[in-house]
């Protein structure tokens, strides 16, 4: 890395922070996340009804989740924190979307591995 004085960053660089809270079930991760100010929860499982926070209907597909993000990007709102709850329930939605888009039976299909590893 070459360095010069004009590469010095002054002050605070404002960027969105990304946080993942990981732990065993029933620890209170969703409750903690939902208790933050100006938060919107995007649930991917139907286990957050007891949490007192703003939340979308349960996302049943990747398109549901992306639809929420699309609206949040286009429309004015006061949310400062977006909570995707939970990532382990979102992962199969993402896999399903990728398989549908790519015509794969599954992400672990041997043919897909060969196709994915080919250089284009």
What residues fall within each predicted segment?
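Conserved P-loop
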Residues: 2, 6-96
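P-loop NTPase motor core
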Residues: 89-120
């Amino acid at each position: 890395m070459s360095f010069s004085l004009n590469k010095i960053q002054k002050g605070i660089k404002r960027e969105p922070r990304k946080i993942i809270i990981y732990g065993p079930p029933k620890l209170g991760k969703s409750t903690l996340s939902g208790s933050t100010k100006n938060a919107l929860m995007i649930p991917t499982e139907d286990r957050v009804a007891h949490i007192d926070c703003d939340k979308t209907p349960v996302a049943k597909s990747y398109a549901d989740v992306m639809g929420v993000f699309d609206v949040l990007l286009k429309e004015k709102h006061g949310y400062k924190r977006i909570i995707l709850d939970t990532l382990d329930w979102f992962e199969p939605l993402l896999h399903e979307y990728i398989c549908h888009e790519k015509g794969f039976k599954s992400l672990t299909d041997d043919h897909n591995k060969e196709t994915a590893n080919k250089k284009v």
